[in-house]
Amino acid sequence: MTSVSLITGAGIGIGRATAKALAARGDHVVVTDVLEDDGRSVVQEIRNAGGEAEFQHLDVRDTDRAKAVVKDIETRFGRIDTIVANAGIAHRVPLEQLTDEKWDHTFDIDLKGMLRVIRPAVANMKARGSGAIVCLSSIMGVAYGWDEHVHYSSAKAGVVGLVRGLAVELGGHGVRVNGVAPGYIRTAQLLSEKHSLGPEGAKTVGDIVPLGRIGQPDDIADVVKFLASDAARYLTGQVITVDGGLTVGRY
């Protein structure tokens, strides 16, 4: 029986790489994103490679839409085997400009957005006695802070709490919940000079990473694929740092 995986923020970056990785192992992948062109593009790539995928537009701030997407998948396939809660934003905002609205906007997507997708899918997973949930945190949520990103660090630290709480609550029902805390990964977000390191900053950081480079989206996707597999059957409640050794080498 083909496994069914739902991924948020799957149009670009880590989400896109994860969609392709799970499709390559044989999953039917439901690609969701607010970026419709990017989402449909990765679906086409997966299909061209012989995999199964579909696109559904989803803004994770929309509770009703999240419920509808989950219900539609469960109605057609009978289940969702894996949820990868990946959608997120990371905008640089100096503290004096960090209004309640900007704080809430980040939390609404980066933390609450995960709950909106997970919550309606849990009943079916519990009834079947199986399921894997993987949430994307960040090294800024588990290891250190970064100036002008206090809202992002706080939200990603909240993801760690979400993973632990859900793991305990759902473990007795056969549902595993884990997380990944990526380090510096070569995505459009990282290469943005407005909100992150930019190309030159990325090169500088890569030079101090013990493994000698910044990460690629595939480096994270492979860990997500492991956590979603039976190879991780006795692993739950953990957030795995994948940063090329940056935090142990520098902090």
Predicted regions, residues:
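Short, small/polar-rich loop/turn modules that mediate ligand/substrate recognition or access, typified
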Residues: 84, 171, 176, 235-237
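Conserved mid-core segment of classical short-chain dehydrogenase/reductases
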Residues: 67, 90-104, 147-151, 191, ...
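Alpha-helical segment proximal to the catalytic Tyr-Lys
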Residues: 123, 168-169, 233
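Active-site helix of classical SDR
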Residues: 118, 155, 163
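Short C-terminal tail/terminal secondary-structure segment
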Residues: 224-225, 236-251
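Residue(s) in the substrate-gating loop at a strand-loop-helix junction
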Residues: 138
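Substrate-binding pocket helix/loop in short-chain dehydrogenase/reductase
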Residues: 80, 94-95, 102-107, 201, ...
